[in-house]
């Protein structure tokens, strides 16, 4: 069954995740395919992006699609006063799929409700970033061969980081042993996210209390751009630094992930450890997004 919109991690079933992982395996080493020849992908990035935009662009090209779009709101008619709905309607005329990033929570869902073509959410405010969760889980699957039964530690800004929301929701499709949520009290996971989870969650402020139990340490930067109060940001901006002292307390086969960009939350000395998998994680973005494009736009014998 072809996917329609991918606005939230919850739009994917467990079977969807594994089917995308299988496709990503097949796409990992290909140079160019023509599966999406004749298709046009719009990259509608109303908010700045480097890795996400470029990896989506590369994924579309490697499948044979043409790519149009923009990299900032200032380069669109929105700067002249056009509303989001009209922009989405116009992009419907030019393309077969819209990959969208926006600063407002819920923007991708809004777009999906008026769009006749698939919307893929590339990040909307502090809400979700479902394709990053796909990459995160695929990395874990590649390293361990499974996702079920693992203990996770999510560390840093758990209030404003949309990658955290998507990962927590995606994990409801699996069977994690437990999740440690490690953050300052000001940056705890929001209640509406916690209420939808179906696995054990333990909140703490001290990573040293739980690091020895963790298989996957998922680190996020403090999201300065999401803070309304500059003083609040200053209080928490360097709450945690993952350094060699912390890493040396991890399980030998434990891994460290980060959606990037990194600022100061992971000491660069950690990069050379066997636990550091965040650059490997980033390298999987293109095959995962190729797999997603294929699921959304590829021809099906049963269509």
From Swiss-Prot:
Supply the PROSITE patterns for this chain: CARBAMOYLTRANSFERASE
Q: Which GO-annotated molecular functions does the record name?
A: amino acid binding; aspartate carbamoyltransferase activity
According to UniProt, this protein's pathway is: Pyrimidine metabolism; UMP biosynthesis via de novo pathway; (S)-dihydroorotate from bicarbonate: step 2/3
GO BP terms: namely:
'de novo' pyrimidine nucleobase biosynthetic process; 'de novo' UMP biosynthetic process; amino acid metabolic process
**Residues at which carbamoyl phosphate binds:** 51-52, 101, 129, 132, 260-261
**What InterPro entries does UniProt report for this protein, alphabetically?**
Asp/Orn_carbamoyltranf_P-bd, Asp/Orn_carbamoylTrfase, Asp/Orn_carbamoylTrfase_sf, Asp_carbamoyltransf, Asp_carbamoyltransf_Asp/Orn-bd
| Disulfide bond entries | none
- The UniProt annotation places L-aspartate binding at 80, 162, 221
Catalysed reaction, written as an equation: carbamoyl phosphate + L-aspartate = N-carbamoyl-L-aspartate + phosphate + H(+)
Q: Which keywords accompany this UniProt record?
A: Pyrimidine biosynthesis, Transferase
Q: What is its EC number?
A: 2.1.3.2
Quaternary state and partners of this protein?
Answer: Heterooligomer of catalytic and regulatory chains.
Record's function text? Catalyzes the condensation of carbamoyl phosphate and aspartate to form carbamoyl aspartate and inorganic phosphate, the committed step in the de novo pyrimidine nucleotide biosynthesis pathway.
Q: Which HAMAP family does the record cross-reference, listed alphabetically?
A: Asp_carb_tr (MF_00001)
Q: Which family does it belong to?
A: Belongs to the aspartate/ornithine carbamoyltransferase superfamily. ATCase family.
Q: Which PANTHER family match?
A: ASPARTATE CARBAMOYLTRANSFERASE, ORNITHINE CARBAMOYLTRANSFERASE, MITOCHONDRIAL
The name of this protein is: Aspartate carbamoyltransferase catalytic subunit
Instruction: Report the source organism.
Output: Saccharolobus islandicus (strain M.14.25 / Kamchatka #1) (Sulfolobus islandicus)
Q: What is the lineage of its organism?
A: Archaea, Thermoproteota, Thermoprotei, Sulfolobales, Sulfolobaceae
Gene giving rise to this polypeptide:
pyrB
């Amino acid at each position: 069954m072809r996917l329609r919109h991918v606005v939230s991690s919850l739009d994917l079933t467990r079977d969807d995740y594994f089917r995308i992982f299988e496709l990503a395996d097949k796409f990992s080493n290909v140079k160019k395919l023509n599966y999406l020849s004749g298709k046009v992908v719009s990259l509608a990035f109303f908010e700045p992006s480097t890795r996400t935009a470029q990896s989506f662009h590369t994924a579309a090209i490697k499948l044979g699609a043409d790519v149009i779009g923009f990299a900032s709101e200032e380069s669109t008619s929105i700067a002249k006063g056009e509303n989001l709905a009209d922009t989405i309607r116009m992009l419907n005329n030019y393309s077969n799929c819209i990959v969208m990033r926006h600063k407002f929570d819920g923007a991708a869902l809004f777009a999906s409700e008026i769009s006749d073509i698939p919307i893929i959410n590339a990040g909307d405010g502090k809400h979700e970033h479902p394709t990053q969760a796909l990459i995160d889980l695929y990395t874990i699957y590649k390293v361990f061969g499974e996702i079920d039964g693992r203990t996770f530690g999510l560390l840093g800004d758990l209030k404003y980081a949309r990658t955290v929301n998507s990962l927590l929701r995606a994990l409801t499709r699996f069977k994690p042993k437990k999740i440690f949520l490690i953050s300052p009290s000001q940056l705890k996971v929001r209640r509406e996210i916690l209420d939808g989870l179906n696995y054990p969650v333990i909140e703490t402020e001290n990573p040293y209390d739980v690091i020895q139990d963790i298989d996957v340490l998922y680190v996020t930067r403090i999201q300065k751009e999401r803070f309304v109060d500059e003083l609040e940001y200053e209080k928490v901006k360097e709450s945690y630094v993952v350094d060699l002292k912390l890493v040396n307390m991890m399980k030998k086969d434990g891994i460290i992930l980060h959606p990037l960009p990194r600022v100061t939350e992971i000491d660069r000395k950690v990069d050379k450890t066997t636990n550091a998998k965040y650059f490997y994680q980033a390298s999987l973005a293109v095959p995962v997004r190729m797999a997603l494009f294929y699921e959304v736009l590829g021809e099906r014998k049963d269509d």
